[in-house]
Swiss-Prot record:
Protein name: Uncharacterized HTH-type transcriptional regulator SAS2254
Organism field: Staphylococcus aureus (strain MSSA476)
Keyword Transferase attributed: no
Record's keyword terms, sorted: Cytoplasm, DNA-binding, Transcription, Transcription regulation
Subcellular location: Cytoplasm
InterPro entries: LytR-like, LytTR_DNA-bd_dom
Length: 147
């Protein structure tokens, strides 16, 4: 059980969080990630033809570059975005992982991983399709998934 203290002080000029822990562990890291994600975008604007849609980021399974356009893929729709993948990556919460030059996946939609003989990771996603990681991102993927 973690102890929580809240101190309200009108003399403070800004809000801040201090974390006191005997050591760094997964629980502490998840708190840090949650706090960092507070400033991240939780919705995006996507397009289907001439329709404009507000997309809940947590519904997105993967962001892929398709025909030079960034596409957000949910379980039932594909939305074109006007952002570049590197811009999007900066705005997304911590549970999105860059797996290649052209794709970012939501780690909560990863069902299983298969290590290929060529060193790549085949990621099976919960929408019944799979994708491959790039070797360039392999170290980062393993760190983010704690494998």
């Amino acid at each position: 059980m973690m102890k929580l203290n809240l101190f309200i002080n009108a003399k403070e000029t800004e809000s801040y969080i201090d974390i006191h822990a005997p050591k760094m562990n997964d629980h502490v890291q998840s708190i840090i990630n949650a706090v960092n994600d507070l400033d991240k975008s939780h919705t995006l604007v996507g397009y289907i033809d001439k329709e404009i849609h507000i997309i809940n980021v947590s519904d997105v399974i993967t962001f892929q570059v398709i025909n030079k356009n960034v596409t957000a893929i949910t379980s039932n729709q594909k939305f074109k975005l006007k952002l570049r993948l590197y811009e999007l990556e900066k705005q997304l919460p911590q549970h999105f992982i860059r797996i290649s030059k052209s794709e970012i996946v939501n780690k909560y939609y990863i069902e299983k991983l298969l290590l290929e003989p060529n060193g790549l990771i085949r990621m099976y996603l919960k929408d019944a399709h799979y994708t491959y990681s790039s070797r360039r991102y392999l170290k980062s993927i393993k760190e983010r998934l704690s494998i």
